[in-house]
Every structure is written in C-alpha cells, then in structure tokens.
Amino acid sequence: IETLFLFTAFESIDESFDVIVTNPPIRAGKDVVFSFYEGAFKHLKSGGKLYVVIQKKQGAPSTSTKLKEIFGNCEVSDKKSGYFIFRAEKNMS
C-alpha cells in the first residue's frame, strides 16, 4: 500500500493508491472540491476507495451526488454529530 500524507493537487503525482482519505477544503468552493474528487478517482487503483469526511451543512448532499456521478456509487460509512463519512469505490470492469 502506498501512503500519501498531505497534498493539495494531483497534477504532480504519477502514482495510484488503494485508499485516499480527505476532509476537503469546503471554503475553497465546490469547483475545487469536486475537482479533487475527480483527481482522486483518476489516482485510485481498481477497487480503491475514497473516504470523505464532511458536515451535512457544508455540502454533504452535493458531495454524495457528485461522488455517485464520478464513481457510480457512494455509501455513508458512518455519521455522527452532523458529520458524514462517505465511501466511494473505484470499480473498473
């Protein structure tokens, strides 16, 4: 398993990962956050998972919709005190 601890963009990364975990920078705006999700999809191995921690009031519904659009799936892995952890898996047939 490759590990990536901190980064802001995927442009300079040539690797693929099994898991990417993020608490996205919501204040940067939806365009930035959604672009990150698209970059994560491109950099996940087949069967790789993206985990997103996000507050309901800061875009959880639109994140769920966007992840379903990009990955074709999105599940609530956990939720507590207004926070959601979404899991999307890259399934390549």
Predicted regions and their residues:
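S-adenosylmethionine
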Residues: 1-93
